[in-house]
Amino acid sequence: PEKAGWSVEKIAEGWDVLMRGLGYDRFFAQGGDWGAMVTSAIGAQNKGGCAAIHVNMAVATPPPEVLASPTPFEAQSLMRAGWYQEKDSGYSKIQSTRPQTLGYALTDSPVGQMCWIIEKFHGWSDCDGHPENVFTRDHLLDNVMLYWLNATAASSARLYWHSFAAGNLAEVQVPTGISAFPKELFRPSRRWAETRYK
């Protein structure tokens, strides 16, 4: 967006307005990655139009009982989340603190923009170390070009800046389905997810 201020919550409000403007009084929402955060915000805001949501990257704070006595699945999920925070979230730190600086660099360099995005496909997909095992080269380049041709490196990074500043993991009251795929960054158990998704 050209204007600043588009946090997860504002995007969720925009989706609700869009759906109603298109004539949908009731709808379902689904999302993964940032889409999961937006979809969760749609469910939390619960303006009456969203009947249910589905996310495939549920973000919820682990409750004390999970931290005190995790199941094997929960222990693995906690370990992966810890690894992510310590070893794999550097991109998130710079995007949430210096989005414009990063934006200028990526907008000025098509190779830099490509590396910034393809590295995420490498690390976050179930690709056995090579993104082209699961994505075509055209798919990868299409994704990169969405950012490059529109010069949206800075505005997309600002999503982190605006959303992390809010720090909101509001409770979701609408019916929710969650998929926890093997290579997902965050994979809460049911009791863990139920701390946020009611």
Residue ranges and their predicted role:
Residues D16-V17, S40, R191:
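Active-site phosphate/pyrophosphate- and oxyanion-stabilizing loops and adjacent acidic/basic residues
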Residues W6, Y91-K93, F135:
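Short helix-capping and inter-helix turn/linker motifs at the boundaries of alpha-helical repeat units
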Residues A68-P99, L169-E171:
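The feature captures the conserved acid-bearing segment of alpha/beta-hydrolase catalytic domains
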Residues D16-V17, D25-F28, G49-H54, Y104, ...:
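Beta-sheet entry/capping signal
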Residues Q95-K198:
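C-terminal subdomain of alpha/beta-hydrolase-fold enzymes, centered on the catalytic histidine
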